[in-house]
């Protein structure tokens, strides 16, 4: 009975913390206008990152929890993010966003974002079709996306890319506007 009580308490505390983080993100995402395309970058969560208020042995922050956090921008702001189960569910992509949508994907890594911003470094990335024949949604991101959500819990070094202009920040994320080059 004690183990069950401890598990219920841990789960409740974890939900409380995730709810606080997601509420923080929802408030900051108000900078994203309706119809905008949102690219998500997620740095690996440090192994020592734990849920606040929960013993470390019971509550590690799980990266999977944040993979689809951008779906809140779809709900709240009528924005687009590229891997929202399209094709496998009744969710359809508008013709405008078909070229930057994937049925199954995960956020970009910081390395992919940095390399793909530079045409020379982008050549070293694998940007061929996936198992269902879709190209990576993030290719040519500076030309196709309007905003970048960078999730890193404040622990990852961020590259200085001229394409990114910070517009909002939270305790574990930053939102950037994509600045398109004039060339």
Please place each PLM-identified region on the residue numbering:
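Transmembrane alpha-helical segments
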Residues: 1-17, 40
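Generic, low-specificity signal for short hydrophobic/alpha-helical stretches with a mild N-terminal bias
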Residues: 7-11, 130, 158
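Solvent-exposed soluble domains appended to multi-pass membrane proteins
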Residues: 149-183
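Short periplasmic/luminal acceptor-recognition loop of GT-C membrane glycosyltransferases, typified by
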Residues: 18-21, 28-124, 131, 141-153
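Generic secretory/membrane-interface signal
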Residues: 1-4, 70, 165-168
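A short acidic, amphipathic alpha-helical/loop segment
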Residues: 24-28, 159-162
């Amino acid at each position: 009975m004690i183990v069950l009580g401890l598990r219920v308490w841990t789960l409740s505390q974890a939900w409380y913390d995730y709810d606080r983080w997601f509420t923080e993100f929802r408030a900051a995402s108000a900078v994203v206008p309706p119809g905008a395309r949102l690219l998500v970058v997620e740095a690996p969560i440090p192994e020592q990152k734990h849920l606040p208020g929960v013993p470390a042995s019971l509550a590690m922050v799980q990266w999977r929890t944040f993979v689809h956090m951008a779906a809140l921008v779809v709900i709240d702001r009528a924005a687009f993010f590229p891997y929202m189960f399209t094709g496998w569910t009744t969710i359809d992509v508008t013709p405008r966003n078909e070229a930057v949508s994937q049925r199954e994907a995960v956020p970009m890594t910081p390395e992919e974002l940095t390399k793909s911003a530079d045409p020379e470094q982008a050549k070293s990335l694998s940007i061929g079709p996936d198992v269902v024949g879709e190209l990576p949604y993030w290719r040519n991101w500076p030309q196709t996306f309007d905003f970048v959500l960078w999730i890193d819990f404040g622990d990852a070094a961020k590259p200085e890319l001229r394409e990114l202009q910070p517009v909002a920040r939270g305790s574990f994320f930053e939102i950037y506007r994509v600045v398109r080059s004039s060339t």
